[in-house]
């Protein structure tokens, strides 16, 4: 239901050019599926496979995800002139986060429904949607929930390809300095502060290398590899 709300509300909701608060994206160590509950999810059960695939492709190809760290970086590194679909994780989160406090809560959902013309949404329905998350719905939790639902249609190779361009030796790592230079000089340029936030979320190792394979796994699965 969250994704349906996003796709329906996009023409009616004007996003600010830059959100006032940027969250630090901390990848969950072992964000596990809510096994029995996922299939009948109030949040996701309304979407068919084609809608899910469209979301995944837009997540992989979006030219810029405004809100968070390395997810933004991945999208900025993808090919210029790619999909302009609004159904990206960050854009979706921004739409749902009506009060711009960095979290999606019951009142945010109520306001989003109201923007779509549905005024009298029952508290029980809103509470059921919120309770599907393991905790407060910040961007990390939001991304994890989508990652859990979207397993099976992961465009992981598409995402990896954007990074492999810079991995000339095929080691699975790219130099953080190279990524920083590209992000600050090409396409929708990052500021110095945005780059710092990105590396705070997914820091390079002591040699300055960034493990982009694990990053891509987090993007598409919502959790880190063992």
Curated annotation (Swiss-Prot):
Question: GO cellular component annotations, sorted alphabetically?
Answer: cytoplasm; cytosol; mitochondrion
Q: Identify the Pfam families for this entry.
A: EF-hand_6
Span of domain EF-hand: 84-119, 154-189, 190-225
Q: Which residues form a coiled coil?
A: none
A Gene Ontology molecular function term of the record: calcium ion binding
Keyword Chloroplast set for record = no
Binding locations of Ca(2+): 97, 99, 101, 108
Kindly state which keywords UniProt assigns to this record, in alphabetical order.
Calcium, Metal-binding, Repeat
Highest taxon of the lineage = Eukaryota
Q: Which InterPro entries match?
A: EF-hand-dom_pair, EF_Hand_1_Ca_BS, EF_hand_dom, Myosin_RLC
Q: Subunit structure, per the record?
A: Myosin is a hexamer of 2 heavy chains and 4 light chains.
User: What else does UniProt say about it?
Assistant: This chain binds calcium.
Would you tell me the protein name for this molecule?
Myosin regulatory light chain 10
- According to its UniProt entry, this protein's organism is Homo sapiens
Q: What gene does this protein come from?
A: MYL10
